[in-house]
Each structure stands twice: as C-alpha cells, then as structure tokens.
Amino acid sequence: MKNIYLNAGTISDVFNGLENSFSAILNSNYNEFKLNLNTNLTKGQIQGITFINGITAVQVEMTFFDDVMLSMESLGTSSIVFAYCDCDRFKHSFGSTGQHISIKKHHSALINSNRSINTVLHFYKNTTVQFSLIKVETGNIGKAVNDSLLFNLKKTFLNKQPNNCYEGLQNIKIAEKLKHFKTITEPGMVGHILKKDCIQSILEMEINDNTAALQKLSVSINRSAVKQINELKKMYNFIKPYTIGSVYQKVMHSKNKILIKSFLEEN
C-alpha cells in the first residue's frame, strides 16, 4: 500500500503536492489545473478549476496499480465537499482508523467536519475510478461575489456533528449537469464563466434537494402525529362510555351493599 499525505492550502498547493507525490506532469492556466499521471503506481488525469467565490471543482479519472491511501489535512470547519462517483468505487474516512464510507458508482456523498482531523480517501489496486469533487469554502461570506448561494449552502449543509459524511444515490439531474460540465471546452473567460454557472447550478440543486427532503420529512411527521392523535381520540371515545358505566355500576353496587347491611342490622 502507498500512503500519500497532502498539506492543506489553495488548489494550487494541492495540485503541486499531487504533482510531487505521484511524479506527475502539471499544467495550469487561468485558475485551471491539469495533472497527467503515468507511473508504476497510477495512470490517468486530474483536472481542477477554482472560482472567485470560494468554489472549487475537481474531476478525477485514475487507474491504480496498488492500494493507495490519500490523506489530506483537515477540511476546516467552514468547508463543504460534495463527491460524485461515476465509475467503480472509493472509500472515505475521517482519519486512517475512522469509519470507512464506500462511495460507489452513481452515488454521491456530502462531507464536512468541525474538528481538526484528516480527510482520507482510499483507492484499491487494479481499479479505474472516476469521480468529481465540488468543494465550497463558506468562511468568507460577505467578501465573496455570490453571498446568497454560499449563505444558503452554509445554512443547509454545515452540520453541528463533529464529523459528517452522508452517502446516497446521485440526483439524475445533477449527474447530467456534471456530464455537461465535462463537455465545456471554450477557452479563457468564456469557458470559465460557463463552468462556474454549471457548478453553481449543481449546488443550487443540492440545496433544493435537501430542502425538499426536509419538507417531505416534516409533512410525514405531521401526518403521523395527526394520525396518532386521531387514533387516541377514537380509543378515548370508544372507552369513555364503558368507563363511565363501570364507575356508575361500582357506585350503585356499593350503595346497595350499604342499604342491605343497614336493613339487616335494624332487624
């Protein structure tokens, strides 16, 4: 197994670290990075782009010829990461000994943490994995260009739990948007803007998905509560006459016993 450790920093720092760790060739231009790998350990490509509002997107397509554990410094308490797997699988854990969450083909994951603990990705020998990452930094709200999007992401996804990794099926519309993102080839500022709009659209869909799920859960809970209340009312209405009748019978029975006893004593 090969263990690789990356320091936290800008996307440029991360790609420089990957270049050194994997003996790769890095090309960068206008906040875009392209890393080509062809060694005894890995073969493939990693591409990344960063936007002015604290959002970074990364696409990975790699074949591993050995097991690899890639450990990265803590994401930071204000970071949110969305992961989307398109081919095969990989695993995520907080720390090397933390719980392993498998992110499979056509599945996605939400990752955030409010503790200083490394984020670890686990890759397996003789597998070709394809996945996309979208990292959102919400710590600079107020200074960023698109405050409302970052604010809503922070409000919706930053969890108060120490470490959080949720995995589930991909949203089909988001998967289609990611495919479209990969087809954008316009150079320079035009391509940059098109890619930014596409990624922001994906993030808005993530917010809507989460909000809709919470609303459905709330409706379900409310319906369940109303149903239980109605059932209790039915039970009460069913039991009530029997309860009153039973009490009345006990009172009358006691009263009759007293009268009979008094009559016998007098005679």
Segments the model singles out, each with a brief description of its role:
Residues 59-61, 81-85, 130-137:
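Short hydrophobic beta-strand segments that form the core of ligand-binding sensory/regulatory domains
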Residues 205, 237-267:
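Basic/polar phosphate-binding segments, predominantly the helix-turn-helix DNA-binding elements
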Residues 5, 93-222, 226, 236-237, ...:
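Alpha-helical bundle regulatory/interaction domains
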Residues 76-98:
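Glycine- and acidic-residue-biased ligand/ion/polar-headgroup-sensing regions
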Residues 64-66, 88, 138:
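Beta-strand elements of well-folded, non-transmembrane domains
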